[in-house]
From Swiss-Prot:
Pathway assigned to this chain's UniProt record: Lipid metabolism; phospholipid metabolism
Localization: Cell inner membrane
Quaternary data: Probably interacts with PlsX.
The protein, known as: Glycerol-3-phosphate acyltransferase
Natural source organism: Brucella suis (strain ATCC 23445 / NCTC 10510)
Extent of the signal sequence: none
GO MF term list: acyl-phosphate glycerol-3-phosphate acyltransferase activity
Catalysed reaction, written as an equation: an acyl phosphate + sn-glycerol 3-phosphate = a 1-acyl-sn-glycero-3-phosphate + phosphate
Transmembrane segment boundaries: 10-30, 60-80, 86-106, 116-136, 139-159, 166-186
Family, per entry: Belongs to the PlsY family.
UniProt keyword annotations, A-Z: Cell inner membrane, Cell membrane, Lipid biosynthesis, Lipid metabolism, Membrane, Phospholipid biosynthesis, Phospholipid metabolism, Transferase, Transmembrane, Transmembrane helix
Amino acid sequence: MAEPGFFNAMLIGALIFGYVLGSIPFGLILARLAGLGDVRAIGSGNIGATNVLRTGNKKLAAATLILDALKGTAAALIAAHFGQNAAIAAGFGAFIGHLFPVWIGFKGGKGVATYLGVLIGLAWAGALVFAAAWIVTALLTRYSSLSALVASLVVPIALYSRGNQALAALFAIMTVIVFIKHRANISRLLNGTESKIGAKG
């Protein structure tokens, strides 16, 4: 049996590994490589896929979405070789890294894509629940932000109902953070001024 000190060091190492991986600002990097400048200077100023889409480059936005998700998936799957606790630590680290990336002044995205990526890595069936909730909400309301909020809210409930308390607790914490990062969106939703899917600007 591993010593407690080694176990704790392993978890800290997994957390740091996940954070560094999650901190890679793919939206910013891809936009610059495509000659679109600093994505933080347009729209919401966010580095995520939704704001990259405001450049008008759908392929670039899709690439950003995929890469931001893969950060979470890769962190969780690689760390899983050292056990579920390490995978959870690395996944959470990747999520936090995306939100607060050290490379660009700790001002990152809102975490939805990386949330989904971590979910794929830790509980792929939960990712199907997320996708279903997102699609249904989007079809009914046309609000991307609301769809993400509803989907993230459903996930920990679904995980808990399946008896996976550890993952349910992790994603409950991540969901709270997602809601906090979407404060402005929630305010606009309540005021009826939130942009709908397909709207420009």
